[in-house]
């Protein structure tokens, strides 16, 4: 009887081996493809969205308001910056007041009409502040000043062209100045006057007339009792002549591009003279006004 191997006969309904291999390979490829697709989609960045423009609802940029130009108000120098100017027989004296205990005064003398000046401030006496300045005995000078560490009120006089000074009590009785102990009082040879304002400065006197500056206005007294306005605006300095007439140095931009010097019955414009610096004015022996303003020293004619 013939022998039949079991391997030579396949069971009915079984799938051939090669077909199984093909199916497995197809499945592997399908799974790999799906995995690659998933990874690719994960790594791809989302499309960039265009920025959205937010509409404005009537927003307007405010118009800048121009800053108004401040009005410049002129006023006479007061306190340490106050100036004094005096002359006699061709000798000139000038000074800045200073402030006793803090700002040193400066006193100078000239014999060549202000071309050169010599410092004659008596520092060796401890001068602290100058309150008035006037010529004496033709070519000498005198002043009312606060002296020493305690600011003692004294009259001072020189007989040596300003090299040496000595106290003199008669000067206090004959001088006009603002009382340092009471700035609202004007001391005169005829007595003490109440000032016409709260901050008087630039007081000068001559032949019974006393004149003082209040801000940029000026007043005068001829009876040692009452004051009357000069009726001039912008007064920076004044002086009183030997016959009691008042001359002023003024800032008046409407009529003068510089310093306007107003004498009784006449006015002279000195061009290019600063009106924003301390000023002093006086009359020489011929009655001609001289002005010391800033670094300028000049006559009107």
Task: Describe the role of every protein-language-model region.
Residues 7-49:
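Hydrophobic single-pass membrane-targeting/anchoring helices
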Residues 38-129:
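Extracytoplasmic low-complexity, Pro/Thr/Ser/Ala/Gly-rich segments
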Residues 70-75, 117-123, 164-168, 190-196, ...:
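A short beta-strand motif characteristic of beta-propeller blades
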Residues 77-86, 125-136, 169-181, 197-207, ...:
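Repeated scaffold domains used in trafficking and secretory/extracellular systems
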Residues 92, 97-102, 147-151, 251-255, ...:
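Short glycine/acidic-enriched loop and turn motifs that connect beta-strands
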Residues 110-111, 156-159, 220-222, 260-264, ...:
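Conserved Ser/Thr-centered positions that define the repeating blades of beta-propeller domains
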Residues 213-277:
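Intrinsically disordered, low-complexity segments enriched in Gly and acidic/Ser/Thr residues
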Residues 282-301:
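Blade-level signature of beta-propeller repeat domains, shared across WD40, Kelch, NHL, RCC1
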């Amino acid at each position: 009887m013939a022998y039949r191997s079991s391997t030579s006969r396949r069971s009915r309904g079984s799938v051939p081996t090669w077909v199984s291999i093909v199916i497995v390979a197809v499945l592997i490829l399908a799974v790999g493809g799906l995995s690659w697709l998933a990874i690719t989609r994960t790594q791809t960045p989302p499309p960039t969205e265009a920025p959205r423009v937010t509409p404005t609802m009537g927003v307007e940029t405010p118009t800048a308001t121009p800053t108004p130009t401040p009005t410049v108000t002129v006023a006479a120098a007061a306190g340490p910056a106050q100036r004094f100017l005096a002359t006699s027989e061709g000798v000139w004296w000038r000074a800045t007041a200073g402030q006793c205990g803090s700002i040193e005064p400066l006193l100078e003398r000239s014999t060549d009409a202000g071309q050169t000046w010599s410092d004659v401030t008596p520092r060796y006496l401890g001068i602290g502040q100058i309150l008035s300045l006037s010529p004496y005995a033709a070519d000498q000078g005198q002043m009312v000043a606060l002296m020493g560490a305690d600011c003692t009120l004294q009259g001072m006089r020189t007989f040596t062209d300003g090299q040496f000074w000595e106290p003199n009590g008669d000067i206090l009785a004959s001088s006009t100045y603002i009382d340092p102990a009471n700035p609202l009082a004007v001391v005169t040879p005829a007595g003490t006057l109440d000032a016409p304002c709260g901050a008087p400065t630039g007081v000068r006197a001559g032949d019974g007339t006393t004149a003082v500056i209040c801000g940029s206005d000026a007043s005068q007294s001829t009876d040692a009792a009452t004051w009357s306005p000069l009726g001039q605006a912008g007064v920076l300095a004044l002086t009183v002549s030997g016959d009691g007439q008042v001359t002023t140095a003024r800032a008046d931009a409407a009529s003068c591009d510089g310093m306007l010097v107003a004498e009784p019955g006449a006015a002279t414009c000195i061009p290019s003279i600063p009106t924003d610096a301390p000023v002093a004015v006086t009359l020489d022996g011929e009655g001609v006004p001289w002005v010391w303003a800033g670094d300028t020293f000049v006559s009107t004619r």
